[in-house]
């Protein structure tokens, strides 16, 4: 079994590549050359520095057609998550495309940012998972869920497990609205514990 002692020696190119492949989404030859010869702690500190890149907000520029919901006609949502003048009357419109926009927004920004926090957020996304397509509910719920994962990515997993039980996307994904006191296997708590914490 590998030692659990902190490895404080400078990394050669092979070990630096190994660390970078696991700690970020991509790296350049210039980054590899600059980090080779540094200790793991120095490299991780460098990867934790936020870039000056400003995150753009998800934007829905499309005018909603009438489709199956006539109340959606001729409404543009634009930056619906952070627009203080946005009217909530079209919130039910285009939730599928909006969830896809949030997912695309997240991926675009993490690739640009490319920090350890982003890689850890992705790890938590694959651990405390919900479904992007209808499984997370409204697009705003999916957006909040990603931000929750990002906030706790370098903090306590126990705290995240507690907080995520109040998250709308997770509650929707695990059918909290369908709890049944007469069927112990059909409730949110059992599903959450089995899937994400203690198992069966």
What kind of feature is each model-predicted range?
Residues 1-101, 108-115:
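N-terminal module-boundary/linker segments of secreted carbohydrate-active enzymes
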Residues 6-7, 11, 27-41, 45, ...:
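Primarily short, surface-exposed interaction patches in extracytoplasmic proteins
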């Amino acid at each position: 079994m590998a030692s659990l002692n902190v490895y404080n020696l400078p990394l050669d190119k092979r070990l630096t590549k190994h660390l970078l492949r696991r700690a970020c989404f991509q790296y350049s030859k210039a980054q590899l050359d600059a980090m080779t010869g540094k200790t793991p702690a120095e490299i991780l500190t460098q990867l934790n520095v936020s870039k000056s890149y400003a995150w753009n907000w998800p934007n829905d520029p499309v005018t909603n057609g009438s489709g199956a919901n006539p109340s959606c006609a001729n409404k543009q949502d634009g930056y619906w998550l952070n627009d203080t003048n946005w009217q909530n009357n079209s919130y039910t419109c285009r939730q599928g495309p909006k969830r896809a926009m949030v997912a695309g927004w997240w991926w675009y920004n993490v690739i640009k940012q490319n920090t350890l926090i982003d890689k850890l957020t992705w790890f938590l996304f694959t651990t405390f998972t919900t479904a992007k397509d209808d499984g997370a509910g409204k697009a705003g719920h999916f957006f909040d869920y990603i931000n929750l994962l990002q906030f706790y990515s370098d903090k306590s997993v126990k705290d995240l497990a507690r907080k995520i039980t109040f998250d709308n996307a997770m509650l929707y994904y695990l059918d909290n609205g369908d709890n049944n006191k007469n069927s112990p296997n059909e409730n949110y708590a059992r599903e959450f514990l089995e899937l994400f914490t203690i198992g069966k």
